[in-house]
Amino acid sequence: MKKIASYYLMTLGLSSLTFGLLLGFYSFVMYGDMIIALFTAAIALLYGFVVYGLFAVPLQMKLQKKARTFNVMYLLIYSVVAFIAAFLFFVINEPASIAWTLQSYFYYMLSIAAAVIYWLWDSLILYKRTASGV
């Protein structure tokens, strides 16, 4: 059981780190300021850790009962959950922004990136786990 929990934590940590680095890089490209990029990366890492922990890890535990690596259906499920989580995050921060959120390319980019990142790390770590026989 401890071994399986370590795989969930590894997926959570690596996904959050990748998400933070991706948004930090995006911020650096958009604004050209390293301080803003580092701050964005740190905030995104924390945001990713909390949101992945609340939404993705329980879903991952449910999906791991029939463990399949690089399953496109899992990517679609993670995408739907990512869209819901990002929508809730945007609406909680700015309740009057529902129309803006749905029109924003950043909402779609953030949701798809979050889903793909988690799905990729989940599949890679699951592949490693099944190869080691755990």
From Swiss-Prot:
Its main location: membrane. It is found in: Cell membrane. One of its GO terms (cellular component) is plasma membrane. Keywords: Cell membrane, Membrane, Transmembrane, Transmembrane helix. It holds the Pfam family UPF0715. It is a multi-pass membrane protein. The chain crosses the membrane at residues 9-29, 35-55, 72-92, 106-126. Belongs to the UPF0715 family. This is UPF0715 membrane protein YoaG. It comes from Bacillus subtilis (strain 168). The gene is yoaG.
